[in-house]
């Protein structure tokens, strides 16, 4: 199960704590299926609050420092992310995707409970060669 929304960009941390966190805690406490949380946009100021949701994993958008998120989430919560799906993955060359994936993977060295992933959904027009380049880097690690 996945839940997604833009509330990280729309709410201040105080407003997120008051309006979103109680609902997300209740939701994730009641779910027995594997699940993760993805909040689109800039959630850097919300990282510790996201961990408090109780989600098994948290997916980070490309505009957020992935390594900083991993240091906050690990080892209790899995970090997912965050190659830029609407940027380099969609518009870059396979070589550019491979470089970005390598930088992403290097930034997470030493952080437990990490799953390399895209920053958001993969756009339909993403070249298959770019997806392959991303997966090749991930598999080589």
Segments from the language model and where they lie:
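Active-site loop segments of alpha/beta catalytic cores
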Residues: 1-141
């Amino acid at each position: 199960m996945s839940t997604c929304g833009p509330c990280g960009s729309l709410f201040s941390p105080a407003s997120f704590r008051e309006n979103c966190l109680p609902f997300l805690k209740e939701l994730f406490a009641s779910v027995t299926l594997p699940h993760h949380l993805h909040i689109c946009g800039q959630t850097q100021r919300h990282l510790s609050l996201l961990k408090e949701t109780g989600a098994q994993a948290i997916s980070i958008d490309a505009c957020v420092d992935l390594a900083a998120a991993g240091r906050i989430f690990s080892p209790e919560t899995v970090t997912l992310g965050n190659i830029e799906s609407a940027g380099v993955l969609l518009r870059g060359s396979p070589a550019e995707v491979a470089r970005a994936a390598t930088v992403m993977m290097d930034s997470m060295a030493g952080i437990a409970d990490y799953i390399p992933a895209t920053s958001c959904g993969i756009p339909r027009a993403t070249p298959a060669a770019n997806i392959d380049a991303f997966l090749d880097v991930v598999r080589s690690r």
